Structure formats: C-alpha cells, structure tokens
A protein has these predicted regions:
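Outer-membrane beta-barrel translocator/receptor signature
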Residues: 11-97, 104-109, 212, 449
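Transmembrane beta-strands of outer-membrane beta-barrel pores
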Residues: 26, 46-52, 79-83, 94, ...
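Residues on the lipid-exposed face of transmembrane beta-strands in outer-membrane beta-barrel proteins
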Residues: 58-62, 98-102, 214-220, 258-264, ...
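Repeated loop/turn-to-beta-strand initiation elements of outer-membrane beta-barrel proteins
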Residues: 68-73, 107-112, 225-228, 268-273, ...
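Outer-membrane beta-barrel domain signature, strongest for Gram-negative TonB-dependent receptors
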Residues: 94-283, 450
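Solvent-exposed loop segments that connect transmembrane elements
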Residues: 124-198, 295-321, 360-382, 414-426, ...
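Structural signature of Gram-negative outer-membrane beta-barrels, strongest in the C-terminal barrel
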Residues: 272-291, 297, 324-460, 476, ...
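Gram-negative outer-membrane beta-barrel transporters
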Residues: 448, 454-459, 471-589
Length: 593
C-alpha cells in the first residue's frame, strides 16, 4: 500500500521537503508484534480494459518456522503489457515484491525484503503548436518544417540546428515577426482537426526504468521499555528517457542508508509521553546527464509521424552533447529527536528537531557536454543545517480537534537523478522549506462522520534543470476541506474542496521567468506558422505580475459515492470539477474548467 502523507515529515525520517511524501508499505505476513497470519493465503488476478489493457498479478503469504523460530513471508508479482489511448504509446512493466519477518527471540526480531521494478514506456509531452482555437475547437495548424538534415543521416544534429539560428530571444510585447528568419517558417500550411490521442510521442521514444530496493530492519525490546530499531536501506535505479523532438536524459544512481532509532515512552495518570532519537548516515552516488539544448517542440506536424524534419540526434544516442553531465556523490550525517506528549485533558504536543551535515562532490567530465570543453570541471563543498517542527492540538469533549503546526526543514535540492550539478556548488544544493498550518478536524456519529479543514502557507525551493544557476522558490497558500460519512454498511459518501495559489517568488524578485513563447504570446503576429520551425524564447512573466504558477487550478471540488451490494459487487461514482487554468506561465492560453 501507499500512504500519502501531508505536511512535514518526521525528523526521524531524514531531511525532506515540506510539501509531504509517499510512504510505501510492503505486504507482510506479520499482523502485530509476535503475531503472524494464521494460515497460508494467496490470490491471482487478471485485469483487462480498453486499449488492450492486460495486467496479471499473483501473491502468496503465510506463516512458518525456521529452526523452531516463528517466520512469515509475503511475495507479490505483477506483469503488465498494455497499449494506450495515445498513439505510439504502450506500457510494459514487471514488479516483484517480497517481505520476510522472523522472531529470533521474544525480544529480537528481523524484517527484510525488497522490490524489483522494470518499466518500459514513453513520456508524453502532449500537443504542440498550441493556440486557444486548438484548445477550444481542436483546430490545429498543419505544415512542414523546412529540412535541416544536411548530412542525410535521418536526424538533426546540434550543428545543423545552430547553422540556421532557430532559437531566438525576443520581447513578446513588441515582436512583429521581423526577428525570425525564413528558415523558421512552415511550408504547406493549413489546418486540420486534431484528435486528443495525437501527441508528440514518436514511435522510437523511450522511457525505461529499472529499480532495485532492499531493506533490513532489526528490532530489539529491552526490559526497561526501550525499543531499539536498526534500519538498513538500499536502492538503485537506472533511467533512460528519449524524445525525438529534442530531449533526452539518463540517470544511474544508488543510495545506502543506515539509521538507528531509540524509542521509549512514559505513562502516568494524566500524561502519555513518547520519545525517539536517531542518528543516521546516508550515502548517495550518481551519474546523470540531461540533454535539452535545441529542444524544438513545434517542428513536428502531429497529423503525421515524426520524421527527419523534426527528429534531433540525441546525446544519449550520440554519446556526447549533453546540456549538463554530473558524476559525484554526497554523504549526509544526521541526528534527530522528537517527542509526542498527550495529556488526559485532550492536549497534544509534538516537537521535533534534526541536524544534518552534507559533504558533496561533483564532476563534469571533459568532452561530455555541448559547450563544456575537454577538461574535467570539479567542485566540492560542505553544508549543514537544522530542521524543526512543532504541532499543538486539543481534543474537545464534543469531538472537535483544533490544531496548529509550524515547521522548517533543511534538505538537499537535487536533480531528477539525485544529481547535484557542478554549477550549483557551492550555494545551490542545500536549502530550507517552511510551513505554517492551522485547522480543525473531528469525528462524530460514533466515528462514522469525519471532517478536516486546514489552512496553510508553505515556502519551498525546487531545482530548475534549464536554469541550473538559479533554483526557483515558491510560496504556496491554500485551504483544504474533506468530509467522509459512512452512512451505513453499504453506503459511503465523501466530498473534498481545495483552494490553492502557488507564487514563484524567484520571478517576483526578478520580474523575469525564462520560457518558450507560443502562438498566443504575440499580440502583433497573426500567423504563428512563421516561427513554428524554431523556438522564440524570452521573458514569460510579461503578463503575470502576480507570478502565479501555471497548470494548478485555484479551486477544485469533488464528490464520491460508493455502494456495496453485499453480494460481492460494489459500485462507485465520482464527480470532480476544477477551475479553468493557464496552460503556461504567461497565461496566454487558458485550459477550460
């Protein structure tokens, strides 16, 4: 199962961003301390559906004994081979999970297991040549980009792109088309109705991932009430992402962590106090390359397949020409402590603190990047920081629980491949996130009716791979409301509402946000086909003075009803409505509600 956890992570977990996290729980034969499944169990399933969906799963688990010791096991496997609604898209994946539990003594037990996941599919960049008419009516501007593949190898190299100067910085408020060369114009221009399944996916696009995970936990219970847990964790992954329009990347990384958690509790007539403290060490090793220079989205005509008119020679295939290439590692040493205090009166106080130190080194190998030269570029640095969180709540006699939470967390700001770019050392790879939240929640009608209301503000930093010198800091303000009602043993109703606004503080400070400019960004250009063969770029903040992040609806509403017929069948229906929202940072194109 997967837990979606909102808010700050416990300091015991390690350095993390404020916005929440996913917690993966492997299936286990253990149902409590010293307790296992009563008998072996298992299941098989086959799922089919539209677009040739095929998923087969099998699982088996149960109790046993090894050398007279209680033992439990659970193994799960899944294989999928499915097509997709989108053209040129399919999914092939294999998942194997295994979990084992064993009581060595009445005080010492072990839990270990792992997961292997292999995925083959593709990335979907959606539509290109986007206009408001395309969004509203499906009307697409057709036409061919002019040929650039002068050596006839079937792909456009960086040098063939550079020869025509198709990446042009302009001011969208004043540009009238005079800055664009003739080579940027489409030929055989027309219009067509575009299907929603026709996207930028090319037949030879690749998104491949292979992940291996292993964990080994030892739990010891002392005579004086302490729980001592040693947790070992290892994960490695390889990723390859190739897109014909001009983006590719690879990641090869692994992480090893060992953490010891000491926990105890004290109970009196009026107070239950729980305490934990934990030292940890975490080592990350990475090799990663991104290839996004000469990324031309609009050259391909989506009414046909990708051809030599739009297909770029990718760095992952050529073996060089990356925009950035990083090889390195970092070591994170941490110490954390937290307490959870609950008084009989209903008052609860949770406090946590953490200290982290990070040593990082990164190298860009000579000859690997497009403009980096033949010499290695090396950087190293050390950083440290504190994290803390505090939450206070009060459970009233009528079931209402008002609460306030505040937190600040220091974390490593890494790329998608756990990589740290040489250009971000020092100063750009370690930062803090902040959160302040308050709200009220409660249960009524014998806990059959639950609701929660929260109002929050958070600030966090994200890495921007295409602007590696400056990481973007965002401020999020929002309100969330949820209610769930178990009406009876057959009917469950739920409703949700969210209000959120995400502001790019980096853009507010600079009044600048780099981006690609599209058809609706130019008030003085009536025919965007004159530049669809290239990429105009510049400041997309020209009409977004409040620096609101695109693609996030301000208001979202949802209703769900589930009915169990008590004969092995159940039905559910959901209705979701979201506000209209800008598709890009400039707000030139609006996606409907």
């Amino acid at each position: 199962s997967v837990d979606i956890v909102r808010g700050p992570a416990s300091p015991i977990y390690g350095p993390a961003k404020i916005g929440g996290y996913l917690n993966f729980n492997p299936k286990s034969a253990k149902v409590g301390r010293g307790q296992y499944l009563d008998e072996p169990t298992g299941a098989m399933s086959y799922t089919t559906g539209s677009w040739d969906k095929n998923i087969v799963t099998a699982e088996v688990g149960g109790p046993g004994k090894v050398s007279g010791k209680d033992f439990g096991y659970y193994i799960y496997a899944e294989i999928e081979n499915s097509d997709s609604y989108y053209r040129n898209s399919e999914t092939d994946q294999t998942v194997v999970q295994a979990a084992f539990d064993m009581d060595l003594t009445d005080k010492l037990s072990i839990e270990f297991g792992g997961m292997y996941h292999k995925y083959d599919g593709n990335q979907n960049a959606g539509w290109n040549r986007v206009t408001q008419d395309l969004i509203d009516n499906g009307t697409y501007i057709t036409g061919d980009a002019q040929p650039l593949d002068t050596d006839g190898d079937g792909s456009i190299s960086h040098w063939e792109y550079f020869a025509e100067n198709l990446f042009v910085e302009v001011d969208p408020l004043t540009e009238d088309g005079s800055s664009f060369s003739d080579a940027m114009a489409l030929v055989n221009v027309g219009t067509a109705k575009l299907g929603r399944d026709q996207t930028l996916i090319a037949a030879d696009d690749v998104l491949a991932n292979e992940v291996s995970t292993f964990y080994f936990d030892m739990l010891y219970y002392t005579d004086n009430g302490w729980e001592i847990k040693n947790q070992f964790f290892y994960e490695s992954y390889e990723n390859l992402n190739e897109n014909a329009y001009g983006f590719s990347q690879f990641h090869d990384a692994y992480v090893v962590e060992d953490k010891i958690v000491f926990g105890t509790e004290y109970e009196s007539d009026t107070l239950l106090a729980q305490f934990q403290f934990s030292p940890s060490v975490r080592y990350t090793d990475f090799e990663s390359g991104d290839d996004f220079i000469n990324e031309f989205f609009d050259r391909r005509d989506l009414t046909g397949e990708s051809t030599a008119l739009d297909r770029r020679l990718l760095a992952t295939r050529a073996g060089w020409g990356y925009s950035n290439y990083d090889v390195g590692n970092y070591l994170n040493l941490g110490m954390a402590a937290m307490t959870d205090l609950t008084w009989e009166s209903g008052l609860n106080l949770v406090l946590g603190v953490r200290y982290d130190s990070v040593d990082v080194e990164s190298t860009t190998p000579g000859g690997s990047t497009l403009f980096g030269g033949d010499e290695d570029v090396y950087a190293e640095d050390s950083e440290d920081g504190f994290s803390w969180n505090a939450s206070i709540s009060f459970k009233t006699e009528i079931g209402l629980i008002p609460y306030i939470t505040a937190a600040e967390q220091a974390t490593i700001v890494a790329g998608q491949g756990a990589n740290i770019d040489v250009e971000n050392i020092p100063g750009g790879y370690f930062d803090t996130s902040e959160l302040f939240e308050y709200g009220v929640k409660g249960s009524f009608l014998d806990d059959s009716l639950y609701f929660a209301l929260s109002i929050y503000e958070q600030e966090r930093t994200d890495i921007n791979a295409q602007s590696t010198v400056t990481n973007n800091t965002t401020n999020n303000e929002g309100t969330e409301f949820e209610v769930r009602w178990v009406v009876n043993e057959q009917l469950v109703l739920s409703a949700v509402y969210t209000n959120i606004e995400v502001t790019n503080l980096t853009a507010v400070a600079s009044s600048y946000q780099f981006g690609f400019l599209g058809a609706e960004d130019f008030a003085n250009i009536d025919d965007p086909s004159i530049f669809f063969g290239g990429t105009p770029n510049g400041n997309t903040a020209y009409d977004n003075v409040e620096a609101v992040k695109a693609g996030i609806p301000e208001n979202t509403y949802g209703l769900t009803a589930t009915y169990d017929f008590l004969n092995g069948y159940a039905a559910s229906v959901s209705v979701v409505n979201a506000d209209e929202v800008a598709s890009g940072y400039s707000g030139a194109v609006t996606l409907p509600s």
